């Protein structure tokens, strides 16, 4: 949604269920969504982005990062903010196998954590609150009742069982 607000011509999403993909397209206004559980992600990206991916925001890592690096456009960018697919892996994950595309496509890949931009929090909160208030940003909350259910709520993040921000109501 922010990409669209900031001028992106085409916005695609990748999610793990048909329901989440429909939400991305029907409610959030994405141009298309790919279900990584049931679709050929690489093939769909080739169809939807015939010139490659200009910008990929990654919170997942693993196979999805690999596939997207393989579909990078000339001077494409990859922003890394998470790697949730690897967090519970018993072994250390290897780097992406398509990293050479960063060289051949003259791409850039950079990681960050939200605290890197703490000096911009107030400004961002003001701007995003305005977008929410005027309906340009939509969101869902997945509310779990009771502190005793907090571990289950946290696990939803790793299994994809949530739709929206997970909140534990006490």
Region spans (language model):
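Local beta-strand N-terminus motif with an aromatic residue
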Residues: 30, 52-53
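N-terminal Rossmann-like NAD(P) cofactor-binding module of classical short-chain dehydrogenase/reductase
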Residues: 34, 54-57
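Mid-domain Rossmann-like dinucleotide-binding core that forms the NAD(H)/NADP(H) cofactor-binding site
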Residues: 1-38
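C-terminal capping/lid region of NAD(P)-dependent oxidoreductase domains
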Residues: 136-143, 151-170
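Glycine-rich phosphate-binding loop and adjacent beta-alpha segment
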Residues: 8, 24-25, 63-137, 170
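Short, well-ordered alpha-helical microsegments
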Residues: 21, 42, 65-66, 151
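Short amphipathic alpha-helix with an adjacent loop that forms part of the alpha/beta core around
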Residues: 40-51
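Short acidic-hydrophobic, aromatic-tinged amphipathic segments that line or gate anion-handling sites
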Residues: 31-37, 142-149
């Amino acid at each position: 949604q922010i990409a669209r607000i900031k001028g992106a011509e085409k916005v695609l999403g990748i999610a793990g269920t048909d329901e989440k993909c429909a939400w991305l397209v029907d409610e959030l206004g994405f141009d298309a969504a790919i279900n990584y559980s049931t679709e050929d992600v690489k093939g769909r990206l080739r169809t939807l982005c015939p010139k490659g991916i200009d910008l990929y925001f990654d919170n997942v890592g693993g196979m999805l990062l690999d596939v997207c690096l393989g579909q990078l456009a000339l001077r494409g960018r990859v922003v890394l903010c998470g790697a949730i697919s690897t967090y519970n892996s018993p072994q250390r994950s290897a780097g992406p196998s398509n990293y050479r595309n960063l060289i051949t496509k003259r791409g850039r890949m950079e990681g960050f954590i939200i605290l890197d931009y703490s000096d911009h929090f107030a400004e961002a909160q003001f701007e995003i609150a305005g977008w929410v208030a005027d309906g340009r940003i939509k969101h869902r909350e997945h509310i779990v009742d009771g502190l005793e259910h907090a571990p289950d709520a946290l696990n939803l993040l790793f299994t994809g069982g949530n739709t929206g921000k997970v909140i534990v109501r006490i």
